Structure formats: structure tokens, C-alpha cells
């Protein structure tokens, strides 16, 4: 698929993701952690892509191995930016990162973020548990 077609498809997906989050009640004024996903079977190429993403101002996670359903293994990392859930900002980042991925011959696998809402909106079953100093639940009998 050409870069232009990838960009167009990504822009449509971005609008769908943002609208779904807002329709579900995610806070439109919150700062979101936007995680752009990259993968490759070639570590050297992936590392070059990570360096380039860092130079563009993104926080970059360490590369991790991921086993696919067919048993093959790929390497992946995320390029992270924190900002408003703004389609123009996300489109700009996607364009930069899709071009970067094409240059380094790695895969750009889209982006994701987390629902941002009032804490009261969540029913967390663990709210009543106490935790020890290491963060593990204390068992009650």
C-alpha cells in the first residue's frame, strides 16, 4: 500500500478511535498518552526507527519480543507522546511516523491510548483490598 493510502486509512481510523472514546464518555479535555506502535523482525532497523522517533521528540520504550499466533516472533516498541485527544495533532504524528517507518523499513502498527474519565466511572473490584509495601494484596481470612 502506498504511503498516501496508509495515511488516508490511518486518518480515518484516528477519527473513529477519537469519536468512540468521546462517545464512551472519555474526557475531551484530558491529556492522553498516545502510544504509536512499531514492529519488525530486524532489530537493527527497529533500533534505527526508535532513534529517529526519539529525535522527533517522542518518548521511546525498549524493544520487546512478541510471539504471534503462528509462533513467529517479532520485535516491537512504542513511540509515546502526551497531549490532547486532537485529531490534527495525531494526524501530524502519524504522518511523521509512517514516513519514518517507510524510511527504516519497519511496520507502523497504528496508535492507541487509554480511556480518561472520572474515577467514579470505574467499578474496581480491588478497591476494598489492602496492599503490602511491595504492592501485593494482603490476604484476609
From Swiss-Prot:
Provide the residue span(s) of the region labelled Disordered: 119-141
Keyword Signal set for record: no
Where found? Answer: Cytoplasm
GO terms of molecular function: endoribonuclease inhibitor activity; enzyme binding
Q: Where is the composition biased (Acidic residues)?
A: 119-132
Q: Which InterPro entries match?
A: RraB, RraB-like_sf, RraB_dom
Cellular component annotations (GO), alphabetically ordered: cytoplasm
Tree of life domain = Bacteria
User: What SUPFAM superfamilies does its record include?
Assistant: Hypothetical protein VC0424
Tell me the keywords, alphabetical order. Answer: Cytoplasm
Please give the Pfam families that the UniProt record associates with this protein: RraB
State which residue ranges cross the membrane.
Answer: none
Assembly mode: Interacts with the C-terminal region of Rne.
Describe the task this protein carries out.
Answer: Globally modulates RNA abundance by binding to RNase E (Rne) and regulating its endonucleolytic activity. Can modulate Rne action in a substrate-dependent manner by altering the composition of the degradosome.
Assigned protein family: Belongs to the RraB family.
Q: Which NCBIfam families match?
A: PRK11191.1
Name of this chain's protein: Regulator of ribonuclease activity B
Amino acid at each position: 500500500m502506498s504511503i498516501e493510502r496508509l495515511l488516508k486509512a490511518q486518518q480515518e481510523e484516528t477519527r473513529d478511535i477519537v469519536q468512540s472514546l468521546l462517545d464512551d464518555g472519555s474526557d475531551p479535555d484530558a491529556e492522553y498518552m498516545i502510544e504509536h506502535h512499531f514492529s519488525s523482525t530486524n532489530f537493527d532497523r527497529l533500533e534505527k526507527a526508535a532513534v529517529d522517533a526519539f529525535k522527533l521528540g517522542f518518548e521511546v520504550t525498549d524493544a520487546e519480543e512478541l510471539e504471534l499466533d503462528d509462533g513467529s516472533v517479532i520485535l516491537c516498541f512504542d513511540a509515546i507522546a502526551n497531549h490532547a485527544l486532537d485529531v490534527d495533532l495525531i494526524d501530524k504524528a502519524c504522518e511523521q511516523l509512517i514516513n519514518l517507518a517507510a524510511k527504516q523499513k519497519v511496520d507502523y502498527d497504528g496508535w492507541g491510548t487509554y480511556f480518561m474519565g472520572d474515577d467514579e466511572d470505574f467499578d474496581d473490584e480491588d478497591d476494598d483490598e489492602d496492599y503490602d509495601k511491595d504492592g501485593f494484596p494482603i490476604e484476609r481470612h
